[in-house]
Amino acid sequence: MADPAGTDGEGTGCNGWFYVEAVIDRQTGDNISEDENEDSSDTGEDMVDFIDNCNVYNNQAEAETAQALFHAQEAEEHAEAVQVLKRKYVGSPLSDISSCVDYNISPRLKAICIENNSKTAKRRLFELPDSGYGNTEVETQQMVQVEEQQTTLSCNGSDGTHSERENETPTRNILQVLKTSNGKAAMLGKFKELYGVSFMELIRPFQSNKSTCTDWCVAAFGVTGTVAEGFKTLLQPYCLYCHLQSLACSWGMVMLMLVRFKCAKNRITIEKLLEKLLCISTNCMLIQPPKLRSTAAALYWYRTGMSNISDVYGETPEWIERQTVLQHSFNDTTFDLSQMVQWAYDNDVMDDSEIAYKYAQLADSDSNACAFLKSNSQAKIVKDCGTMCRHYKRAEKRQMSMGQWIKSRCDKVSDEGDWRDIVKFLRYQQIEFVSFLSALKLFLKGVPKKNCILIHGAPNTGKSYFGMSLISFLQGCIISYANSKSHFWLQPLADAKIGMLDDATTPCWHYIDNYLRNALDGNPVSIDVKHKALMQLKCPPLLITSNINAGKDDRWPYLHSRLVVFTFPNPFPFDKNGNPVYELSDKNWKSFFSRTWCRLNLHEEEDKENDGDSFSTFKCVSGQNIRTL
């Protein structure tokens, strides 16, 4: 038989192991190497690291690390998902405290029960919606068990949730509040809890973020203590007055400030400024202007400003002093309409809207204007003031002669102009200056047949520009043939010293030829005035511009003797910048009338005797000084 595979004995045959025994030749007294331990036995430990397995271990470690990292990430994602799903099931701290009291109560006290603890089911105000899978009842029972378990653990002190809440920072608390459905209501509630006054009692709300105001009331939440201390100094360069209060709570420092800035700002600008100075989000701020006419709000700022809880910088706003300082309460007076009428008369303010707006702006310095704002019938007061002012101005104008009126208009213009621009323009239009002065002299005096001047010419020759500049200086009236269908289109002539009809066309000349011949003559005419009987008056001097020379047109022969015609043949000149070469402004007309005063024969007998004003200053109030606030 053949030999079996393998070997029969150890080390037998040609393929066996060779046993080699080392022979150490050592004699007594030879030195033994420090690396050798003669007494130790050969255990084979020196052969442990004979084979290098580092690469195997490193690969295994990397695989285990990646698996652990993936497991940690998955666990974190699952925890967040569970937290989102069970957020509404977390019990509030107040319920935990009440449960602790119930669990720690003594058996005797617990046996005493006033309420009837019925075990029957009650109707729920907020029922859980059915998921559609029929597991709503099971989920509700599990939720109750979880809440009871959390309550028990929080009462026994063995759960870590309570310790985590104690370690929460103020910033984390305020962020949790802002994540709620109504963060503004939470901040308003915290403000009232700390300061004992509602924030809405101190402010008047602005709906728009673009509305500007100089005074602003701000409540800031979640401010750190160091920032609150430094903010007192950082805010001063931006404001004229600041009133700062700060109280600490679980949210951090809650600051209340009343600030008057150096210029008017809107809410967006203030949010950006305070976000940079306080290092908090704009969602942590309540920014509104203060109540300016609330005595209670003014007293709050006044009293807290004197206490040690406030830091005040700058001069106290006048609206606080007006409602708190005793002297200002003595100066409060009743409204006097005559003072308002006198103010409107002196400032030539006769439009109702302008009277209301400008007089309200004087409330900070005029006690009568302040009383006007406190009145409940401001609209009626404004209407009465405008009506009386127009009556006084109308009567004053009627008593003045044309020379007195031109002198009063010259006194209204403060600048000094150049009369030569008007003369150069007339020469440019080929009009003799002497003939124009003669016609203007008779025109201003209202001499019959010379009471109307017609400026005729081609388009773009400066007819309307010349006439409008003269009417603007003399504060005349403008009538338009477009309103001729109305019975009252000539009514402005009743209160004017001079009138103008611009761009008369063929239908307009037909109307003048049929109905206004007496008006062109300068004779008394009857004019229909709204809400009054027919008014008889002498028609004021009338200046007409037209492209039609009605003074020579055969269609209107009866107007030839009633019109003084001047023709403008040349186009109006402009410089390379588009500005008029000849400036026809109020100051140049003032210089023109001052220069030609004697040539126009505007002097009167009483003016020669007395160079002063013939009319004294009008007064509708008794002489007294206006008391300022």
From Swiss-Prot:
Motif Nuclear export signal, which positions? 105-114
Presence of keyword Protein transport: no
Q: Which residues carry this modification: Phosphoserine?
A: 92, 106
- From which domain of life does this come? Viruses
Position(s), cross-link Glycyl lysine isopeptide (Lys-Gly) (interchain with G-Cter in SUMO): 538
Gene3D superfamilies under this entry?
3.40.1310.10, P-loop containing nucleotide triphosphate hydrolases, Zinc finger, large T-antigen D1 domain
Location of the SF3 helicase domain: 431-581
Keyword list, A-Z: ATP-binding, DNA replication, DNA-binding, Early protein, Helicase, Host nucleus, Hydrolase, Isomerase, Isopeptide bond, Nucleotide-binding, Phosphoprotein, Ubl conjugation
Give the residue ranges of motif Nuclear localization signal.
86-88
**Does Nucleotidyltransferase appear among the keywords?**
no
Q: Supply the Pfam families for this chain.
A: PPV_E1_C, PPV_E1_DBD, PPV_E1_N
Task: Report the subcellular localization.
Answer: Host nucleus
Example of a GO biological process term: DNA replication
Q: Which PROSITE patterns match?
A: SF3_HELICASE_1
Q: What is its main location?
A: host cell
Example of a GO cellular component annotation carried by this entry: host cell nucleus
What does the PTM comment state?
A: Phosphorylated. Sumoylated.
What this protein catalyses is: Couples ATP hydrolysis with the unwinding of duplex DNA by translocating in the 3'-5' direction; ATP + H2O = ADP + phosphate + H(+)
Detail which positions bind ATP: 457-464
Identify the EC number(s): 5.6.2.4
Region described as DNA-binding region: 166-332
Oligomeric and partner information? Can form hexamers. Interacts with E2 protein; this interaction increases E1 DNA binding specificity. Interacts with host DNA polymerase subunit POLA2. Interacts with host single stranded DNA-binding protein RPA1. Interacts with host TOP1; this interaction stimulates the enzymatic activity of TOP1.
| Function, in words | ATP-dependent DNA 3'-5' helicase required for initiation of viral DNA replication. It forms a complex with the viral E2 protein. The E1-E2 complex binds to the replication origin which contains binding sites for both proteins. During the initial step, a dimer of E1 interacts with a dimer of protein E2 leading to a complex that binds the viral origin of replication with high specificity. Then, a second dimer of E1 displaces the E2 dimer in an ATP-dependent manner to form the E1 tetramer.
Q: Which family does it belong to?
A: Belongs to the papillomaviridae E1 protein family.
Q: What is this protein called?
A: Replication protein E1
Query: What is the organism field in this record?
Result: Human papillomavirus 31
**Organism taxonomic ancestry:** Viruses, Monodnaviria, Shotokuvirae, Cossaviricota, Papovaviricetes
Give the gene symbol: E1
